[in-house]
Amino acid sequence: ELIHNIEPEYLYTFIKTAMDEVPDIALGVFLQCFGGLRKSEVVSLEYKNISITTVGDKKSMQLTLKDKDLREDVSTAFLAHCKRNRIQTVLPAYDDLLWELFEKHKKRYKKEGCSAVFVDADGRAMTDAVYYKRFSILKERFIERLRNSDNFDAKSYAVYLSTYKWSTHLCRGIFSNLIAQGTDNIMEIAAWRGDKNLSSALSYLTDRKQMDENALRILDELYKGEIG
C-alpha cells in the first residue's frame, strides 16, 4: 500500500529535515509539496522558468513547466518528463520559507553555464535517478527524526511511515490533499495538479476528510507558519 500524504503536524518537520539533511533538493521538495510538481518536473526546471511577482506585501512564485531534457547525454535522465506544459503557482506556506529556500539555493547551487535549478555533485543538471536517491535519504532521516522524538505520537507515526511504501509521489499527494480540502470542484483540483485525466483528481475528492472553510484555514495557517 502506498502513502499519499503526511499529517499536517509533521509537514514542517519534513521540510526542515530536507533543509538540514539534503539541502540540494530542499527547494525541490517544497515545490513538490506546495506546487504539486512531479519529480521529473523538478529536475527539468530552469531559472528562466521561475517568475516572482509582488502584490501588495505578498510575493508569489509561478513556474513555467515545459517538457525539456536537460541531460541528453543520459538516456534515463528524465523518465517521466513534464506530463503537461503549464504555469504552476506555488503556495507560499510557512510565511517566508519559500523565499529563504530559493535565495539559499541560488547562492549555493547556481552554476555558471548551467541553466538547471537542481544540479548534481559535478555541477550538471540533476537526473531523475539522483533526485530519487537524495529523496530516499530524506525519507530515512525524517523517519529517524520522528523516531527519536520525545513525543509518543511522533514515534508512532515513524513506525507508520516505515511500514508503508512512499517516495517523491508523496509530496504531490500532500499538495493535492491541500487543494482538495479547499474545494469540491474536480476541474479546479485537476487544474491545480496539471492533470489531463480527471480520475486522478477525483481520488482526492473521495479521500478527503473535510472540504469546507476549515481547508482554507489550513492553507492560511500554513502561510502564516502556524502549522508544524
PLM regions and their residue ranges:
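The alpha-helix within a helix-turn-helix
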Residues: Q32, V43, A190
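Short, basic (Lys/Arg/His-rich) helix/loop patches that form interaction surfaces
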Residues: R124, Y132-A191
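Conserved tyrosine-mediated DNA breakage-rejoining catalytic core shared by Y-recombinases
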Residues: L45-E100
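Residue-level marker of regulatory loop/turn positions in helix-turn-helix DNA-binding domains and
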Residues: I3, D20-V22, L31, Y160, ...
